[in-house]
Design a protein with these regions (language model features):
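Non-DNA-binding regulatory cores of transcription-related proteins
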Residues: 68-150
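The C-terminal cap of the DNA-recognition helix in HTH/winged-HTH DNA-binding domains
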Residues: 19-22, 33, 51
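Key DNA-contact positions within bacterial/archaeal DNA-binding proteins
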Residues: 40
Length: 150
């Protein structure tokens, strides 16, 4: 399963925000420069994360971004679902975006031989992503504040 550049950049931006948690706001240009993220793309990512309730922002010369929640309360799964949408390998096993497989000969049956395996794949991916928090990555970077839950 491959994640998008949007998720990759979003996670890298959140590493910067995690390192600044409990400190001064960080400006998007600083995030862009430190993480080599194109500023136009970063603006879209930060807006999506803000709209999802993970970030706060302040406009103006002393403005910038900050995490609303502590980094030990934000999982990779949350971030990736916000930026990329559901991670199910096929739509008929998605928890959040379930769709019947329209062209599948088993769609109207009670059992699909593929669905069970794909459900296991979905659950394994979710288990990994939902059990790793931003604070773990900040710790590996040697960053983060004492309040970050490290």
């Amino acid at each position: 399963m491959k994640f998008s550049k949007k998720s990759e950049y979003g996670l890298r931006a959140l590493l910067e925000l995690t390192a600044h948690y409990g400190k001064a706001l960080i400006q998007r240009q600083e995030i862009s420069d430190r993480q080599n993220i194109p500023i136009e793309f970063l603006e879209q990512i930060l807006l999506a994360l803000k709209n999802a309730g993970l970030l706060a922002s302040k406009r103006g010369i002393s403005g910038g971004y900050s995490l609303i929640k502590p980094p030990d309360q934000i999982t990779l799964g949350q971030v990736i679902r916000i930026l990329d949408g559901p991670r199910a390998p096929i739509s008929c096993v998605s928890k959040t975006a379930y769709q019947k497989c329209g062209d599948c000969p088993y769609a109207d049956k009670t059992h699909c031989p593929i669905q069970g395996v794909m459900l296991d794949v979905r659950n394994a991916i979710a288990d990994v992503l939902d059990n790793h928090k931003l604070s773990e990555f900040a710790k590996q970077m040697g960053g983060g504040s004492p309040d970050a839950g490290l």
